[in-house]
Amino acid sequence: MAEEKSKTTLLKEKIMMTEPKGVKALSEEEIKKADSFCDGYKKFLDNSPVEREAVRYTVELAKKAGFAEYEQDKEYKAGDRLYYVNRDKAIALVVIGKNGVKNGVRLAIAHIDSPRVDLKPNPLFEANNLAFFKTHYYGGLKKYQWTTIPLSLHGSVVKLDGTRVDICWGDDENESCFCITDLLPHLAREQASKPMAKAIEGENLNVILGSRPYDADSDEKDLVKLNVMAVLNEKYGICEGDFLSAELCLIPSFKSRDIGFDRSMIGGYGHDDKVCAYPAVMAALDVEMPEQTCITYLTDKEETGSDGNTGMQSDFLRFFIYDLAKQDGVDGYRVLSKSTCLSADVNAAFDPTYASAYEANNCSYINNGVIISKYTGHGGKYDTSDASAEYMGKIRAMLENNDILWQVGELGKVDGGGGGTIAKYVANMNVDVVDLGVPVLSMHAPFEIVSKTDVYMAYRAFFTFFDTKE
């Protein structure tokens, strides 16, 4: 006979939260689904390191799923599936719902830019018979992490005649790669005494390119630089002046890998925020006939403030929704006012090695599912959207009622630093929004870590958000 529970135990079970079971709550079948889903994610991650490549790969996935390119003057009906590209660096995937847009749209918005090292407009120089690129780092990175690792060159160059050349050098193991040097420890006493942020100066993130002269017998200057340019000219048909109209960057040249003896995690470059972008993309591809129109939007420039005409502060998405509203005979601002959004962005996973940076009761943990961040920002909740209790309640109920692993947390301790997402820019359009994403270890490093089950829970969250009637 089972022992009768005490009054205290019964009350505790009724009104107190229980410790999350995390991955232990999942069946073997569910874990296998997560592992299988992440096979596709790793392909996406490896093929989408920068924005243009992420958009191209997403278009390929969308076309295979029956999506067609958006035509501005075309009439669309329920069930139609379309994509709309903004300057090759942002993309919207849309599934027209049974009710069109008159009752609002459901948005899942992720970003596809990641911290990296960009080239300066005049990057190529030679010093002491070595050729280098001058760089300007992009986003919030720890500069020392980018030295002495293999780097690949990615991006696009527009030549004087207007033709665009896409460049990718260093990803293939049989290709050469590039590197930023560091000072040997034997001579680094002064460097080692500096604060971490100053030990490697941004101006010293010079990328080594070559060491052999074009013609050893020539009296011309800068022959190593000339040799580098000759190689680029032969392969891509570009001249040194073409760097002035180029978008080129250095990113880690290693591919994603399973992490751990149990292969339960994925290490790779750009989890922030491809680990939310891919689940949001797949949710849009998999939803069939939703009640409300669903839009997955992959945006650019989040790591530097979401500025520019491909960032979230651009009016591109707003104007697109206005066009959809016009077709349904309603005002665009009314559509936005009835819309809801999941700002699909990552948060910092608790790291026991650096436990003092976190407040253990209010942070996210690997394998505990998606992390809902009611607000981000810094200090006294500056520079953030703070989701309402009502909207938090709706998202909480959606996750709980569909057995999706989830947790709520902040980005570290109060006054310990801070960060932001695109949520505040969505909120400025009068849209209900909250951040929901995947916990990440070593965020903004060249090699970040996520849990496979958390990635799959993100997919389930976005799909359920799109597919649920209310």
Model-based region annotation:
Residues M1-E470:
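N-terminal hydrophobic/helix-forming segments and targeting peptides
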